[in-house]
């Protein structure tokens, strides 16, 4: 059983998945920083300097804090500003992944077209040509 587990872990697919998860986690941090530190301040400057992170709706009358952290300490809140930020993170990440997949698919299609052209352009072997000529001559008789 232990040997089977070792063989399973050593498979390329499992290792590729592990690397993908680790890189994906790091990439998620980069996208979060891009949104939080670059995009959201620009959006805030365009729309009058507001900060999405402190946009919330208190679900009880006891919630009256000016910040999300304070409001959460006072009671339940709908933190729609945080949701907007996470949604923007997701859209950016999805767009980047879409562009990457599209690029890979384009490269694959180009390689396949090139392989097909090479296969079509290659002349048949000499013995096949000879047999084809013999067949054509016999067909004319």
Swiss-Prot record:
Disulfide bonds: none annotated. The keyword Membrane applies. Keywords: Cell inner membrane, Cell membrane, Ion channel, Ion transport, Membrane, Transmembrane, Transmembrane helix, Transport. Pfam families: MscL. GO terms for cellular component: plasma membrane. The keyword Transmembrane helix applies. Channel that opens in response to stretch forces in the membrane lipid bilayer. May participate in the regulation of osmotic pressure changes within the cell. Belongs to the MscL family. This is Large-conductance mechanosensitive channel. The lineage of its organism: Bacteria, Pseudomonadati, Pseudomonadota, Alphaproteobacteria, Hyphomicrobiales. The gene is mscL.
């Amino acid at each position: 059983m232990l040997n089977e587990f070792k063989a399973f872990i050593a498979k390329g697919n499992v290792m590729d998945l592990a690397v993908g998860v680790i890189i994906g986690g790091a990439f998620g941090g980069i996208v979060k920083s891009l949104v939080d530190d670059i995009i959201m301040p620009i959006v805030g400057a365009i729309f009058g300097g507001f900060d999405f992170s402190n946009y919330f709706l208190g679900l009880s009358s006891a919630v009256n804090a000016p910040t999300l952290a304070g409001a959460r300490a006072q009671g339940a809140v709908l933190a729609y500003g945080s949701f907007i930020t996470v949604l923007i993170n997701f859209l950016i990440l999805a767009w980047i992944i879409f562009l990457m997949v599209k690029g890979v698919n384009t490269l694959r299609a180009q390689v396949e077209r090139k392989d097909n052209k090479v296969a079509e352009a290659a002349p048949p072997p000499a013995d096949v040509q000879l047999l084809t000529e013999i067949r054509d001559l016999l067909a004319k008789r």
